[in-house]
Amino acid sequence: MSMEFDAVIIGGGVSGCATFYTLSEYSSLKRVAIVEKCSKLAQISSSAKANSQTIHDGSIETNYTPEKAKKVRLSAYKTRQYALNKGLQNEVIFETQKMAIGVGDEECEFMKKRYESFKEIFVGLEEFDKQKIKELEPNVILGANGIDRHENIIGHGYQKDWSTMNFAKLSENFVEEALKLKPNNQVFLNFKVKKIEKRNDTYAVISEDAEEVYAKFVLVNAGSYALPLAQSMGYGLDLGCLPVAGSFYFVPDLLRGKVYTVQNPKLPFAAVHGDPDAVIKGKTRIGPTALTMPKLERNKCWLKGISLELLKMDLNKDVFKIAFDLMSDKEIRNYVFKNMVFELPVIGKRKFLKDAQKIIPSLSLEDLEYAHGFGEVRPQVLDRTKRKLELGEKKICTHKGITFNMTPSPGATSCLQNALVDSQEIAAYLGESFELERFYKDLSPEELEN
């Protein structure tokens, strides 16, 4: 078996698998490979346990500006449309209602203004008053005593929407389709990359077991590990990493759909939301919490997996200065300490209850169950030159046949949009063709019309 490929993708999560499919379906590349360190695809951030299983299209994510929502909506549409085109309903993609709610007069005023801006972007977006919310999500309004909660509440969303996705199953489907299209493609599992070497006009991707695969172009979609790999080759040395781990709590099956809350604009992390679990039936997830930790990947044991790569990246005065500036803000500092408490046995559950009751006011301590083994690390990029936290996705384009992607949320939602960008770059670099018009025709006709 030849180990030489046109392109090798490092990372078998949903982003890497989406690019594997996109190159196979729409480009003239002959052979593409994925190398993945786990024994199965999509076992880390793309696992159904690691994320909220949400297609983040911007309609109920209150931290998105209208400008960002317009872009994210188109990205989300591609992922949704792929699943519907392939007939993956109720296997990969699921239909539920979804809403964002404002609780209290200040948040309600914000939600009213937001609706006026966002109804032009999202066709069919409905505004919900307190009575309508009670009809759609009775447990959001009813208190423990069976009486409606006293706060003013308003929201908007959809009574029915393809809003939930199992990104691990989607990853598997991408790969199945790609292998059908190009039988010479290859997937290498249990291939943990140790280093990447440039050898003339080819890259050698070398595993810890001394296996080697070769490519004219390497795309690193390795989540938290992308930046250490980049820095090992001399790229991205002006960047650091703030790993933020999210955890969830389970509650009984008390929500019919997704319920999101208003996010503090100062905080780069999602506000607590409720999501019926698409994999574990009869459970609703409340979360995520946000805990910084010195690890690139979450493990059950706190001391297991502390990352030497991370220490190399972050043990410098610029990163400490960014951290100090962040912690100097009272709201951010309180948020960080509160989320540290959420992880503590016994007391954490008691403290988290108040946040969860914003969504389901009747919740009791007995209803909450810490979701062990759920949640994963999201790498937040630190710009050491600008001395600030960079929100969203980060890409290092070397223009030398290797690109590094760091894709925190909503990277899974945007996987096909990111795959489009990367596939075009790869095809252009290799002098191959890419069928952009057919891509849009299949997955985003709206953009083709515009």
UniProtKB/Swiss-Prot annotation:
Domain of life: Bacteria
Named cofactor requirement(s): FAD
An MF annotation (GO) of this entry: L-malate dehydrogenase (quinone) activity
Record PANTHER family: L-2-HYDROXYGLUTARATE DEHYDROGENASE, MITOCHONDRIAL
Family to which the UniProt record says this protein belongs: Belongs to the MQO family.
Record bears the keyword Disulfide bond: no
Protein name in the entry: Probable malate:quinone oxidoreductase
Entry-linked InterPro entries: FAD/NAD-bd_sf, MQO
GO BP of this protein: tricarboxylic acid cycle
Catalytic activity, EC: 1.1.5.4
A Pfam family it matches: Mqo
Reaction it catalyzes: (S)-malate + a quinone = a quinol + oxaloacetate
Primary enzyme class: oxidoreductase
Pathway: Carbohydrate metabolism; tricarboxylic acid cycle; oxaloacetate from (S)-malate (quinone route): step 1/1
Cellular component terms (Gene Ontology): cytoplasm
Gene3D superfamilies linked: D-Amino Acid Oxidase, subunit A, domain 2, FAD/NAD(P)-binding domain
Keywords: FAD, Flavoprotein, Oxidoreductase, Tricarboxylic acid cycle
